[in-house]
Amino acid sequence: MSDRLAVLPQYLLPKQRLTLFMGRLAGARAGSLTTAVIRWFIARYGVDMSEAENPDPAAYASFNEFFTRPLRAGARPLAQADFICPVDGAISQFGAIERDQIFQAKGHRYTTTALLGGDRELATHFDHGHFATLYLSPRDYHRIHMPCAGRLTRMIHVPGELFSVNPTTARGVPGLFARNERVVCVFDGEHGPFVMVLVGATIVGSMATVWHGVVNSPRPGMIRDWRYPEGQVVLGQGEEMGRFLLGSTVVMLFPQDCLRFNAEWAPEKAIRLGEKMGDLFSCTPQAV
C-alpha cells in the first residue's frame, strides 16, 4: 500500500475531537485503572522504566504524569559539544535549508515561512541555514531540552491540523509539519538566533513550556504571539524547555554556516538526549 493511501483515513477522522477526548482521558486520575493502562503501555511499547526517576507504574496518578515522567539523575550525561540532542527519539530528516525549503520526505518539501506561521521576516534569518526534524515515538522520554544555551525572545502558537507525525504520515501528507498545530519558540544564542518548533499530532493532548505551562489549551483558531523582554527567560544547554503530553516531533532551525552536524547522524537513526548533535561552524551572530 502506498503511503498516500495509508494516510487517507486520517483525512476522514475527527482529529480535533479525538485528541480532545484522549487528552481528557490521559489526565484522568482513575486509581488502579490508570495503573493498569500504564502497565499495558509499558509492555506494549517496551518503555524502559529503569531510567525513570520513579520506576513504579503505580506511582503515577494519571497517564499524563507517567508520560511526562522525569529521568533519574545521571541518566543522560551531556556530551562535550556546542549542540546536543534535545530529545530521545529518532532523526526524521536533517541537513541544509535550500533557500527557504525544508526537506520533509521524498517528494515533499515545505517552507520555513509556512513552518513559522507565515512570518517571512523571521524566516529570512534561516535562509540557507540548517534544520533537524526529530521524531519522538510513544516509548520515548517526552521532555524537550535545550540543544545549547539561549535567551527566549518569542513564542508563537500556530493552530492547525492534527495528523499523526509518524514516518508513514511524513511520507504521505504534503507539508505535514507546517500544517499541524505547533508552538514556535525563538531563542538568541551565542551563535545567533535559533528556533525550536514543537509540532502537535493526533492524540497529543497538549504542548507545554517551562516558562508558560500548557500553551494550546484551549485551541483558538488564531495565531498567538508572545514577546519576552531580554533576560526574562534564559536557559542553559541541557535544561528542560518543554514537554509533550503524548508524543510528537521537534523541528529546529539554525542560521547559515553555524552548525556542522555530527558525522554519525543519518535519517532514522535513534538518538538520545545529551548526545552530540554538532559543533559550531562559523557565523556572525544576529539578533532576531
UniProtKB/Swiss-Prot annotation:
GO terms for cellular component: plasma membrane. Binds 1 pyruvoyl group covalently per subunit. InterPro entries: PS_Dcarbxylase (IPR003817), PSD-B (IPR033177), PSD_type1_pro (IPR033178). The record marks G247, S248 as: Cleavage (non-hydrolytic). It comes from the Bacteria. The modification Pyruvic acid (Ser) is found at S248. The keyword Lipid metabolism applies. Keywords: Cell membrane, Decarboxylase, Lipid biosynthesis, Lipid metabolism, Lyase, Membrane, Phospholipid biosynthesis, Phospholipid metabolism, Pyruvate, Zymogen. GO terms for molecular function: phosphatidylserine decarboxylase activity. Catalyzes the formation of phosphatidylethanolamine (PtdEtn) from phosphatidylserine (PtdSer). Belongs to the phosphatidylserine decarboxylase family. PSD-B subfamily. Prokaryotic type I sub-subfamily. This is Phosphatidylserine decarboxylase proenzyme. It comes from Azoarcus sp. (strain BH72). The gene is psd.
